[in-house]
Design a protein with these regions (language model features):
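A well-structured
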Residues: 1-162, 490-494
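Divalent metal-coordination and catalytic microenvironments
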Residues: 9, 145, 263, 296, ...
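All-alpha helical catalytic cores of prenyl diphosphate-utilizing isoprenoid enzymes
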Residues: 173, 177-180, 205-209, 215-229, ...
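C-terminal, non-catalytic "cap/extension" segments appended to globular domains
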Residues: 2, 21-27, 37, 41, ...
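Post-HExxH zinc-binding segment in Zn-dependent metallohydrolases
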Residues: 285-326
């Protein structure tokens, strides 16, 4: 058989993809539908699945096939797939099975307890579980770093964002720090000159859900291959054929759930448009977490908070919640572009959002590199929040260092993806505007087809065929350039 070793690999990775499919849906269920009493058994079942996948991927035959397939006559896509297979294999073989299982169990325990500990502001209880997750994550980072010859944190960063390093992040975030605080202060000062009319609730959850579904429909979500549910923290999971997104509702606050849905719809459209011809293979997966976040932030911020989109969305708001003063066109746009530093990352405006990310990046990097301990987190969080946003989180763990789900299961290295994603989104939107004259008028008229076609051609259809750098350069003519993000914030808010 032609390319026999490569064919063996595709069959193996197809199996892995199917197990991953089941794990993903079981995890979604754990976060949305599972009764509390099911937590321990579900955690054990998911850990067993992690071990099974690890065993398949680390079989020595896989290593032999990879070496032999490198000599076979493969086309461009097959070569890209082999590169991604090799990366997955190398990442898996660095970890002993016992660590994979222990980390999965500790993560499930920590996340499940966090759901009740966060509302109770119980840092003491949470930190005990987090210490175990950090211990195991440090062990994983140490093993990966020894093999890669890098810092422990960079070894975890590479899982989410291949080829990114903390040295490069420090340059990008250093640039951000040189102008963002001043820009933020100017915007806050400018907006203090005008009055805003806040939307008056209550906004019934069922009606909010209807509005969210309407927004998903506008944005091209395929309901035949996906659904919307409720969870403690908004997320997107599942598989390209069956994408699950969630949001959370507050009957006194309309826009948090709505823009949570719009954000997750960006993730979902990317997943739903990944290359089906390569389904089940690593090359068909999303390129990286930053590219994934670029799509959600493209939808939520570049498109969703634009004047043109907000004008188009407003009739759907009027149809469900009437035409109170807050929902005049001028006020609705102003309210959705309001910049107000706050405690919660997922509710942050796009000017102050990077501050939340840089703060978390600096803390998690120091934590994984062994420069600080879990007990140091609350004081550092408070110090950095005061420096960036002038807000104190002292003793307010719920709205400070306990607010995110990411660290509960050892997702250290993920947070930078949000701000990298915002930078990529600004650069992509700038290129789309150049390529599509009359784009703003089309958006105001509710016609997003040309924009989505552009994303499909330039990002979605390529999966992991190209490196992040190649993908962005092909789409925009240059590698990541922070200038577009700065120009976007300046033109929208000043």
């Amino acid at each position: 058989m032609k390319n026999n070793n490569y064919q063996q690999l595709t069959r193996t990775f197809q199996r892995l993809s199917r197990f991953s499919h089941l794990s993903s849906i079981a995890s979604w269920d754990m976060f949305t539908m599972m009764p509390p009493g099911g937590s321990a058994a579900r955690g054990e079942a998911l850990a067993e699945m992690s071990v099974l996948q690890h065993q398949i991927l680390t079989d020595k035959k896989v290593g032999e096939w990879l070496a032999a397939a490198a000599e076979e006559d493969l086309n461009d896509v097959e070569q890209a797939n082999l590169r991604e297979m090799t990366r997955h294999y190398q990442q898996a073989t660095l970890l002993p099975e016992s660590l994979v299982e222990a980390k999965s169990l500790a993560g499930s325990r920590c996340e499940h307890a966090w759901r009740t500990q966060r509302p109770a502001n119980d840092w003491q209880g949470f930190s005990a579980n987090l210490k175990e997750v950090v211990k195991l994550s440090r062990e994983e980072a140490r093993l990966r770093a020894e093999a890669k010859g890098c810092t422990p944190y960079d070894a975890l960063l590479d899982i989410f964002e291949p080829d990114m390093t903390s040295a490069r992040l420090d340059v990008l975030f250093g640039d951000l720090k040189s102008w963002l605080p001043e820009l933020l202060a100017k915007v806050v000062e400018k907006q203090a000159q005008r009055s805003f009319v806040p939307p008056q609730g209550p906004f019934p959850t069922a009606t909010q859900r209807e509005l969210g579904l309407e927004a998903m429909k506008m944005l091209g979500f395929d309901f035949n291959g996906g659904r919307l549910d409720v969870s403690a923290h908004p997320f997107c999971s599942g598989v390209p054929e069956d994408v699950r997104i969630t949001t959370r509702y507050d009957e006194n606050e309309l826009l948090s759930a709505l823009f949570g849905v719009i954000h997750e719809t960006g993730h979902a459209r990317y997943e739903q448009n990944l290359p089906r011809a390569w389904a089940g293979q690593p090359v068909a997966l999303a390129r990286s977490t930053a590219i994934h976040e670029s799509q959600s932030l493209f939808f939520e911020m570049q498109l969703g908070r634009s004047d043109a989109f907000l004008k188009h969305l407003l009739p759907a708001v009027h149809a469900r919640f009437g035409s109170q003063a807050a929902f005049s066109e001028e006020n609705f746009i102003a309210w959705n572009q309001r910049v107000k530093p706050g405690y919660i990352r997922v509710d942050a405006d796009e000017v102050s959002y990077p501050a939340h990310v840089v703060l978390r990046y600096e803390i998690e990097r120091a934590l994984i590199n062994g420069e600080i301990e879990v007990d140091d987190i609350p004081a550092l969080w408070d110090e950095k929040m005061q420096a960036w946003l002038g807000l104190s989180t002292k003793d307010n763990y719920r709205n400070g260092c306990m607010q995110d789900i990411h660290w509960t299961d050892g997702g250290f290295g993920y947070f930078p993806s949000y701000t990298l994603g915002a930078m990529y989104a600004a650069q992509l939107f700038d290129s789309a505007k150049t390529a599509l004259p009359g784009l703003q008028a089309s958006i105001a008229g509710g016609d997003f087809s040309a924009l989505f076609d552009w994303l499909r051609q330039n990002i979605w259809q390529h999966g992991s065929r190209f490196s992040t750098s190649q993908l962005i350069t092909q789409a925009t003519g240059e590698d990541l350039n922070i200038r577009y993000f700065r120009e976007h914030l300046t033109s929208r808010y000043l």
